[in-house]
Amino acid sequence: MITAEEKKIGRRFAHGALTLLLANFLIQVFVLGPDASGYNETWGPIIGISNALQFMAGMGVVRLSGKLLDDKDKPLLTGSIGLAYTVSAVGVVTALVPSAIYNAFNETSLTADMAADFVFYTTPAVFLFIAPWNIQFAKYGKDILPSWGPAVGNTVGYGIGIVTLVFLAGLFPDAAFIPLNVILGVVLTPAWFFAISKAYAS
């Protein structure tokens, strides 16, 4: 059973994840651009810290969702919570690596550019394994989400899953990068976190 204080914290986590996710997408898509690669000296530290905080906020949302949705006797929900929480922890750690290498006191064989590219291309895998949790939350949270919430949650979950698999298969068209990032990252995912915040407030 979730307490009133936990619901309040969960709502704050959802708002934090929404704000940071939107800021990250706006910086990476519209400030740096889709052709940017490597570590950016100006935006790198900001992106790293913002990404880490975003994943931490997401971990809070995911962790408390088990109590919010009463995941007892819901094995797929419980499993998706564990998976999403674990890969989000990976996201927290890797987000800070490029800045740590760039500001290292000694020379390393791994450069900040290499680390930034590594983080950029592991992030789709992280979101791929968070996708099942989105789908499960949409399923079991339909009674406490806004009326439009389950549809958005399923679109985010299945959309990210399909797009990521297409990308990993090497079939992702370059021309679709910005439109899909705008739809999934700037519109639907923040809307989904807003819906989740409403579920915690219900």
Question: Model segments located where?
Answer:
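Hydrophobic, aromatic-enriched alpha-helical segments typical of multi-pass transmembrane helices
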Residues: 1-202
